[in-house]
A protein has these predicted regions:
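Nucleotide/phosphate-binding site architecture used for ATP/NTP-dependent chemistry
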Residues: 2-378
């Protein structure tokens, strides 16, 4: 098995940031500022004032938005169409900002600060939100820096190439690439847009604290044979025996490499020390991160299942963990819903399908469960 979890990136990958340059930074600020104004106006948090009496031949009007700061009042002017359900379509090239009637650069972070009161962003939350916005701009600059594939080529491209080439992320969420917890090297290793090979970490989880669940058509042995193969399974079994552990007392569990290095080795140290969690190494298969960031596609064996793992980074305002209690019931709920859809004549006439989560493994941390009541990032 692969064991090196900390192989450094090349100097070019780890030290240079070619996407952080003035022209690209201005470009992504303009694009995301248009998105922010559109979404916040749609949500009625902001109310741009119409400046023209009649729309032009394309249905656009000019609007202005004023941030009435006492010392430096800022004025944003742009051309936009108001669509059905009060969605806004802003012409990016038209967006212009003045401060004290002097033209100035567009800056999404400064915009958030200027309108924090209208956006109801508290002083406590504001720094975290600004960090998420900055990370989103960082990711956008990375995407705009690379040489993309044409729309014509994408028509016949594989789904994984399409995943890698996606530019927008969540179409409405403004801070949609927050990823607080990733450093620059993590971004290169684990982000969907970087599309690097990722080798999952495999642990043996003791059944006294772990729970495996699956749909009726699967069982644990069948799933592991399919996903790992007989050779790797035999190797894992030998590792457990060498540690005086009975393989029958454990279930095998994939975890995200970032999660292992940054969370599990410390938060679950007691379980590791007492062999309730046993590190087995990295898997041989190469995976690719999907747009949802914690779901992975198997590049080495595409016929194998996607794998979704907990990833305790702050992304889109939420910690991306997975509750072991939710995991215990997820396959059963998915199976019920799948059968419901399959038995619906109308949905089947439209060839409607659902993607099922067919199996799950959860591991409980008894200390945090005793210490915390209600929802928590832990």
């Amino acid at each position: 098995m692969m064991m090196d979890l900390s192989a450094p990136l090349s100097p070019h990958q780890s030290l240079e940031l070619p996407h952080l340059q003035p022209v690209l930074w201005q470009k992504v600020n303009r694009l995301h500022l248009c998105k922010a104004i559109s979404e916040f106006s749609h949500e009625c948090l902001l109310a741009p004032q119409r400046m023209t009496d009649h729309p032009d031949s394309e249905g656009y009007d000019y609007y202005q938005l004023v941030a009435a700061a006492a010392d430096k009042p800022a004025n944003y002017v742009f051309r936009a169409r108001r669509l059905a359900l009060d969605h806004w379509l802003i012409d990016p090239d038209s967006l212009h900002k003045t401060v004290n009637e002097k033209s100035t650069d567009l800056d999404l972070l400064l915009f958030i600060i200027e309108f924090k009161r209208q956006l109801s962003i508290s002083e406590r939350v504001l720094p975290t939100y600004l960090e998420e916005i900055t990370s989103t701009l960082y990711s956008s600059a990375f995407k705009h820096c690379r040489t993309g594939i044409s729309a014509t080529a994408l028509v016949n491209a594989s789904f994984q190439i399409i995943e890698k080439e996606m530019m927008e992320g969540h179409p409405s969420f403004v801070a949609n690439n927050g990823r607080i917890g990733f450093d620059a090297q993590d971004f290169q290793r684990f982000s969907p847009e970087a599309a690097s090979d990722v080798h999952l970490v495999w642990l043996a989880a003791h059944k006294s604290k772990a729970h495996f669940a699956c749909i009726e058509q699967l069982d644990y042995a069948k799933l592991m044979e399919q996903e790992l193969g007989a050779e790797v399974l035999a190797e894992f079994e030998q590792q457990l025996i060498a540690r005086d552990c009975n393989p029958q007392d454990y279930v095998l569990m994939p975890v995200h490499p970032w999660q292992w290095q940054n969370k599990l080795t410390s938060i679950f140290a007691a379980d590791i020390a007492n062999q309730r969690l046993v590190f087995l190494g990295q898997g041989k298969d190469a995976y690719q991160a999907q747009q949802s960031i914690r779901t992975f596609f198997n590049r080495s064996h595409p016929q194998r299942y996607y794998v979704k793992m907990a990833l305790s980074i702050l992304n889109m305002g939420f910690m991306r963990g997975l509750s072991p209690y939710y995991m215990a019931t997820t396959p059963g709920i998915n199976e019920w819903l799948f059968d419901l859809v399959e038995g619906d004549e109308i949905l089947q006439a439209y060839d409607f399908k659902i993607l099922r989560e067919v199996a799950s493994i959860g591991f409980r941390n008894s200390y945090y469960e005793q210490a915390i009541t209600g929802d928590s990032a832990y």
